[in-house]
């Protein structure tokens, strides 16, 4: 089976490298060509354009937002125009529910397969093959690519036959993680203002009721006040909150916390923090409490 991979940012590069390490026949493409070389060194073939990647049987994409995905997939020289009938596009990007539905319909009209498979996990998990795959699409297509998911992740969750529902689940999960980050920041600011060491407080939390990776990883970043390099940049968190709110409006679901989080990301960006890790919103409560400048 020939594979293609488009989008070699920190997440995509780690995922593509996993396929190289598993000795798959892989062709890669990225708009910034300098990102190709590390994968070529690992055994991948570099493509000059999207059409060359689309000679593959399965093409993965890992792109940053709706605009990038629309350009790469629906553009005149994109995946839709070049993927052969029967081949499969697996989109691992975190995009809007509405765009995922459009992609599904567009691929269907061309007799091309489409699976939405956004992931939970940061770049270190991608490089280690420890992602959680959130997949939705036709059962026969998912069965065909499941061995590939096993290369990328420690577990695959199949949520629906409708691809866009995987994106709804992913966005809902990111909303929940952002809620945890903000809550951790607020709680740490409260105890610190009251004279309790924030690292000691975090150790108490993660050694008792909150011994889970989200609290441990992001809690440490907030307590250390160290948000670089960004595993997931704050401007992408802001983008995701907009997508969450758009999905909520479409489904007539009130999400007051999502509106607050959107404002927090906007506040962080206004103070020059859009490229910090998204956990930097957890520092805003300390700033509001005059604990840090």
Predicted feature residues:
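NAD(P)+-binding Rossmann beta1-loop-alpha1 motif at the extreme N-terminus of oxidoreductases
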Residues: 1-62, 87, 123, 155
